[in-house]
Design a protein with these regions (language model features):
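Conserved ATP-binding/catalytic core of the eukaryotic-like protein kinase fold
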Residues: 1-137
Length: 137
């Protein structure tokens, strides 16, 4: 089954997270926008790809996935996405994260072309602040 079949729009994961739409596909997982019905907030759910979760190196990928979740959860910084929860859904590990509305930097760069010096310094400063927090965690 494809990842889209594991979390179709409208389906509720673990009786709590109602999937709204697919946001993006990554190397290890697909990310969906969802609503945490218990707390009434929008979240992002990252669900591991089926071929990794059921493949011969499953244990390694699952450990890497959980290590990523633990590492991110240890960081408290406004420039790093917060991790709220982890679990398993239809045999696939998932992690629930803060949902950040908007576009990514690559998209903005393609649209805008160049940034002012002030905007560039702001972006670099926020990025370095988040990176420093990650190194301290």
């Amino acid at each position: 089954m494809s990842e889209a079949q594991h979390a179709p729009e409208g389906q509720v994961i673990e009786g709590r997270y109602r999937v709204v739409s697919r946001i993006a596909d990554g190397g290890m997982a697909t990310v969906y926008q969802a609503v945490d019905e218990r707390l009434g907030r929008t979240v992002a759910i990252k669900i591991m790809h089926t071929q990794l979760a059921q493949g011969p190196q499953r244990d390694q990928f699952v450990e890497r996935f959980h290590r990523e979740a633990r590492s991110a959860a240890a960081i408290a910084n406004p420039h790093i996405v917060q991790v709220y929860d982890t679990g398993e859904f239809d045999g696939l590990d998932y992690l629930v994260m803060e949902y950040v509305h908007g576009v990514n930097l690559r998209y903005e760069m393609n649209q805008q072309g160049t940034f002012s010096v002030r905007e560039t310094l702001r972006i670099i400063g926020e990025t370095l602040d988040g990176l420093a927090s990650a190194h301290r965690a």
